[in-house]
Amino acid sequence: MADENTPVMPEEVPAVEGVGM
């Protein structure tokens, strides 16, 4: 689920591709 650009659980940054949830 973790993208190469986005962290596993982005808390400070909004979910770009809905990775946060």
UniProtKB/Swiss-Prot annotation:
Keywords: ATP-binding, Cytoplasm, DNA-binding, Isomerase, Nucleotide-binding, Topoisomerase. The keyword Isomerase applies. Its main location: cytoplasm. Residues 1-21 are annotated as: Disordered. It catalyses: ATP-dependent breakage, passage and rejoining of double-stranded DNA. It is found in: Cytoplasm. GO terms for molecular function: ATP binding; DNA binding; DNA topoisomerase type II (double strand cut, ATP-hydrolyzing) activity. Its EC number is 5.6.2.2. It comes from the Bacteria. GO terms for cellular component: cytoplasm. The keyword 4Fe-4S does not apply. Few gyrases are as efficient as E.coli at forming negative supercoils. Not all organisms have 2 type II topoisomerases; in organisms with a single type II topoisomerase this enzyme also has to decatenate newly replicated chromosomes. Belongs to the type II topoisomerase GyrA/ParC subunit family. Heterotetramer, composed of two GyrA and two GyrB chains. In the heterotetramer, GyrA contains the active site tyrosine that forms a transient covalent intermediate with DNA, while GyrB binds cofactors and catalyzes ATP hydrolysis. A type II topoisomerase that negatively supercoils closed circular double-stranded (ds) DNA in an ATP-dependent manner to modulate DNA topology and maintain chromosomes in an underwound state. Negative supercoiling favors strand separation, and DNA replication, transcription, recombination and repair, all of which involve strand separation. Also able to catalyze the interconversion of other topological isomers of dsDNA rings, including catenanes and knotted rings. Type II topoisomerases break and join 2 DNA strands simultaneously in an ATP-dependent manner. This is DNA gyrase subunit A. It comes from Streptomyces niveus. The gene is gyrA.
